[in-house]
């Protein structure tokens, strides 16, 4: 992400603080389950812990935009595609589980399908709310933070381990806890792949998958009452689907790479085979910008110096030409014959005209030097040329006026002598 990037220290502290607050709140909120009077299979109060932890971290730590980058609520075609997968994958897991029950246990349990103490709609709404608050914290917030320094695959592993610890169930023994850990970790890995490359639009996908899984398991299996075979079937089924889905995704992207000869980063941002090195990329980009700015400044300085040099030379040439004009006029002293005076006057006019032409040519030469500079510096060069050109024009006009006065004076003197 291009942004005010989270430093490595803040990144680690954010993950640590989130996990500590989540675990502490999950312990403290257990006592409130009986107080609010809601059954745990409808809504688990401890599931509020990730949501509260995410809100606290957003308020405490800086770079709010980076922290909220995974909390977008817009819809895209990719989101719709992943939403369909979020409904299909739980169905595949449940089908594998039911087939396993029919094969190895002769039947599967349709738990509490009759004689429920609450309507099914209440259970559905409760599971959607539970899925939203949990995934808001773990997927939309925590996984987004972890992915700022890791790619999706390793970020999913980190978040999966934390989620498995949060969801650990040691009530029914070590073996049950081990299969429950496998189930929740595989569950989290599937979710990490589902929300990959969705550009922060994660909450719909994660909530849909989570609610579909928990709602189906409530009715079809009895793992929540400690049945070891049920949790074993669910864990293995979920792990098989996780390996198959992630492996198939990698194969498809690998085929796309072989056919297009483009790397996976071009096909999908934040891929498994490319580690995110935001700090190094930022430093490299800043170094390139600074070097280009230095080169532009050097070019501008050279162009300005050359322009000033041309203007200065033109001014010196104009000043140096003035004495020659005066000397030429002084040589036109009255002669013994009017014809000689007229010829000298014509010579002076010719000299003045030739000097004007040369000066004009020198003025034309100055803009030619502008072609050597960049287009962005043309205004500065024209501004620097404006004052020397005006000065030269004033000097030439004064020289011409002096010459005309001198000619008139010599003509008057010659006419007086003739009289």
Curated annotation (Swiss-Prot):
The record's InterPro entries line, in alphabetical order, gives: Rce1/LyrA-like_dom (IPR003675)
Keywords attached to this entry: Cell membrane, Cell wall, Membrane, Secreted, Transmembrane, Transmembrane helix
Regions that span the bilayer: 9-29, 41-61, 84-104, 118-138, 153-173, 175-195, 202-222, 231-251
Its GO biological process annotations read: CAAX-box protein maturation
Q: Consequence of mutating residue 139 to A? A: Does not affect lysostaphin resistance
Q: What induces it?
A: Up-regulated by the two-component regulatory system WalK-WalR.
Q: Where is the composition biased (Acidic residues)?
A: 372-382
**Cellular localization per UniProt:** Cell membrane; Secreted, Cell wall; Cell septum
Q: Where is the segment annotated Disordered?
A: 273-419
Q: Where is the composition biased (Basic and acidic residues)?
A: 282-299, 323-336, 344-353, 383-419
Q: What happens when the gene is disrupted?
A: Abolishes normal short glycan strand length. Reduces biofilm formation. Cells show an increase in lysostaphin resistance, without a concomitant decrease in beta-lactam resistance. However, mutants are also reported to show an increase in lysostaphin resistance and a decrease in resistance to the beta lactam oxacillin and to an antibiotic targeting biosynthesis of cell wall components, tunicamycin. Minor defects in peptidoglycan and pentaglycine cross bridge structure.
**Per UniProt, what is one Pfam family of this protein?**
Rce1-like
Q: How does it sit in the membrane?
A: Multi-pass membrane protein
Instruction: List, in alphabetical order, the Gene Ontology terms for molecular function in this entry.
Output: endopeptidase activity
Single GO cellular component annotation? plasma membrane
Q: What is known of its domains?
A: C-terminal region not involved in glucosaminidase activity of the SagB-SpdC/LyrA complex.
What function does this protein fulfil?
Involved in bacterial cell envelope homeostasis. Regulates peptidoglycan processing by N-acetylglucosaminidase SagB, perhaps acting as a scaffold protein. Pleiotropic regulator of gene expression, probably acting via interactions with multiple two-component systems. Plays a role in the abundant deposition of the immunoglobulin G-binding protein A (spa) at the cross-wall, a subcellular structure that initially arises from cytokinesis. Probable virulence factor.
Homology family:
Belongs to the LyrA family.
Q: How does it assemble?
A: Interacts with N-acetylglucosaminidase SagB; interaction is direct and facilitates peptidoglycan processing. Interacts (via N-terminal region including transmembrane domains) with sensor protein kinase WalK (via N-terminal region including transmembrane domains). Interacts (via N-terminal region including transmembrane domains) with sensor protein kinase SaeS. Interacts with other histidine kinases, perhaps via their transmembrane domains.
- Protein's name according to its UniProt entry: Lysostaphin resistance protein A
């Amino acid at each position: 992400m291009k942004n005010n990037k989270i430093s490595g220290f803040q990144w680690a502290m954010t993950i640590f603080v989130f996990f500590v607050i989540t675990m502490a709140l999950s312990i403290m909120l257990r006592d409130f389950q009986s107080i609010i009077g809601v059954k745990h299979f409808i809504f688990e109060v401890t599931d509020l812990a990730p949501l509260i932890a995410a809100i606290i971290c957003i308020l405490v730590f800086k770079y709010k935009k980076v922290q909220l980058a995974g909390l977008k609520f817009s819809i895209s075609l990719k989101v719709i595609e992943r939403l369909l997968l979020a409904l299909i994958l739980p169905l595949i897991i449940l089908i594998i589980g039911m087939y396993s029950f029919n094969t190895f246990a002769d039947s599967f349990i349709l738990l509490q399908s009759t004689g429920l103490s609450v309507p099914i709609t209440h259970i559905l709404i409760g599971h959607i709310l539970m899925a939203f608050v949990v995934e808001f914290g773990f997927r939309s917030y925590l996984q987004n933070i972890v992915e700022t320094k890791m790619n999706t695959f390793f970020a999913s592993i980190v978040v999966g381990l934390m989620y498995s610890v949060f969801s650990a169930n040691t009530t029914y023994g070590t073996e049950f806890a081990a299969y429950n850990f496998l189930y929740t970790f595989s569950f989290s890995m599937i979710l990490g792949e589902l929300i990959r490359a969705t550009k922060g639009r994660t909450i719909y996908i994660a909530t849909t998958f989570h609610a579909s899984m928990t709602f189906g398991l409530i009715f079809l299996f009895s793992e929540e009452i400690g049945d070891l075979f049920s949790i074993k079937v669910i864990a293995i089924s979920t792990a098989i689907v996780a390996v198959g889905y992630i492996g198939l995704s990698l194969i498809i992207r690998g085929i796309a790479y072989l056919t297009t000869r483009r790397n996976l980063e071009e096909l999908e941002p934040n891929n498994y085979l490319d580690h995110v090195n935001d700090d190094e990329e930022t430093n490299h980009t800043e170094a390139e910008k600074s070097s280009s700015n230095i080169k532009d400044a050097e070019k501008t300085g050279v162009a300005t110096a050359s322009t000033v040099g041309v203007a200065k030379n033109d001014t010196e040439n104009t000043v140096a030409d003035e004495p020659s004009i005066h000397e030429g006029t002084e040589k036109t002293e009255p002669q013994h014959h009017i014809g000689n005076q007229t010829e000298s006057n014509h010579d002076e006019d010719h000299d003045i005209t030739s000097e004007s032409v040369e000066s004009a040519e020198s003025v034309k030469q100055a803009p030619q030097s502008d072609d050597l500079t960049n287009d962005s510096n043309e205004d500065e060069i024209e501004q620097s040329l404006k004052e020397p050109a005006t000065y030269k024009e004033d000097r030439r006009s004064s020289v011409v006026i002096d010459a005309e006065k001198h000619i008139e004076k010599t003509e008057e003197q010659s006419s007086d002598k003739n009289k």
